[in-house]
């Protein structure tokens, strides 16, 4: 229990860092390693949750569609999702009762999909994108706009709403304050106490990763782990690293496997540093920025969290990253979940599917640094997504989502 609490403290440090967009790393540990803390008043702030939606949110009319237009919708079922049935996220893939509960929800979703196909779509097969059961009990499906009310009237259906889709805002530029952030969040002190993220798994749900970037070099990561384990009197095996074999063990529970036929743990495992990579928006293994126009924001965020503290030299030796970035948890593994790609911006159901996979993979922290400063409004689909995110507050996985990326 003590070990888990310490890991959770490190995860919370990551939350502080990522949601403020302050830290992409430091050149080296500053001479003054005393942490300075600044209290920030939250007086007058309110969260735009379902509970205060009437007071603080503006509900807009859904986009005008013709009845025959096919749209992507959430079909939310009445039963509670698995995590709201009292199951912990930690080790959930090995929890037989939790997995049985998930299968039971999937069975009801399958029966409902068959009913929709037969009675609403006149025998046409319903196209299902995701069957969500852990954080949400919902199917995301393609449906004629004019059929939404008919589906919502079916027994066992709680609600039907459009799935929000998000896009990268090209007006926003990286504006990171990195000089004093290490002191502000106390990462230097955490490192001095031995908390470097070793044994942690951090999921980045974003635009992907530059997998060839030296900040994520596996040899340098392995060297750093050796240094850390030796200093702490441990073996690298003590850190329970995510491996291809461990991914294979939970593969049947991963949404990624539903979208990619013949998927294996070896294909998802990139390296000891980049322990997992999947493209949820395009249903491919391409997690890079090379083949789309969605930008390299994901690499920036992954660097904030996990950039290595050593770089590999040409002669095979290693040097501290004096002239590069060092993440808050440099010894943590990064789990890359690309939700922006060739098919454009992510849908909210892609986010949830990625989060559920991160939970199955036993990630300690899940980051969605996807907020925008652009003025917007809340639709019913966005309110539902917010509610799903809020429900994760009570789990033992730290899930954080930024309110914006333009704070200064």
Predicted region positions:
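Bacterial N-terminal signal peptides that target proteins for export
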Residues: 2-13
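Hydrophobic core
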Residues: 14-22
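Sec/Tat signal peptide C-region and signal peptidase I cleavage site
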Residues: 26-29
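Subtilisin-like serine protease catalytic core
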Residues: 31-32, 68, 189-278, 282-347, ...
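Inhibitory N-terminal propeptides of secreted protease zymogens
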Residues: 31-170
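Active-site-proximal beta-strand/loop segments in catalytic clefts of secreted hydrolases
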Residues: 76-80, 143-144, 163-165, 204-208, ...
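Short, solvent-exposed loop/turn and secondary-structure capping segments
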Residues: 86-88, 153, 162, 170-175, ...
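Catalytic-core segments of hydrolase enzymes
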Residues: 212-214, 363-408
């Amino acid at each position: 229990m003590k070990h888990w609490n310490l890991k959770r403290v490190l995860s919370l440090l990551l939350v502080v860092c990522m949601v403020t967009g302050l830290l992409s790393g430091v050149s080296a540990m500053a001479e003054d390693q005393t942490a300075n803390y600044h209290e920030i008043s939250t007086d007058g702030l309110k969260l735009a949750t379902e509970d205060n939606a009437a007071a603080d949110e503006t509900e807009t009319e859904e986009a005008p569609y013709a009845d025959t237009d096919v749209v992507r919708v959430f079909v939310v079922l009445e039963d509670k999702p698995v995590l709201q049935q009292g199951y912990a996220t930690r080790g959930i893939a090995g929890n037989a009762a939790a997995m049985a509960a998930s299968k039971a929800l999937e069975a009801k979703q399958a029966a409902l999909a068959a009913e929709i196909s037969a009675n609403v779509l006149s025998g046409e097969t319903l196209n299902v994108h995701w069957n969500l059961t852990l954080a949400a009990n919902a199917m995301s499906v393609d449906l004629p706009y004019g059929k939404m009310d008919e589906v919502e009237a079916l027994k066992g259906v709680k609600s039907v709403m459009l799935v929000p889709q998000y896009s990268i805002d090209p007006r926003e530029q990286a504006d990171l304050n990195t000089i004093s952030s290490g002191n502000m969040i106390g990462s230097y002190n955490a490192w001095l106490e031995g908390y470097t993220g070793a044994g942690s798994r951090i999921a980045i749900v974003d635009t992907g990763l530059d997998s060839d970037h030296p900040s994520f070099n596996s040899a340098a990561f392995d060297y750093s782990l050796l240094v850390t384990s030796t200093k702490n009197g441990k073996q690298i095996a003590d850190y329970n690293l995510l491996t291809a074999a461990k991914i294979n063990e939970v593969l049947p529970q991963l949404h990624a496997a539903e979208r990619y036929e013949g998927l294996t743990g070896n294909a998802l495992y990139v390296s000891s540093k980049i322990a997992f990579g999947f493209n949820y928006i395009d249903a491919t293994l391409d997690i890079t920025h090379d083949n789309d126009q969605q930008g390299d924001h994901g690499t920036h965020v992954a660097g904030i969290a996990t950039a290595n503290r050593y770089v590999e030299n040409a002669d095979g030796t290693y040097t501290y990253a004096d002239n590069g970035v060092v993440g808050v948890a440099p010894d943590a593994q990064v789990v890359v979940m690309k939700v922006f790609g060739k098919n454009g911006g992510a849908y909210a159901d892609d986010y949830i599917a990625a989060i559920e996979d991160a939970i199955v993979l036993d990630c300690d922290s899940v980051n969605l640094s996807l907020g925008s400063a652009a003025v917007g409004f809340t639709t019913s689909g966005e309110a539902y997504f917010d509610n799903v995110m809020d429900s994760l507050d009570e789990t033992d996985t730290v899930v954080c989502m930024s309110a914006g990326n333009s704070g200064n």
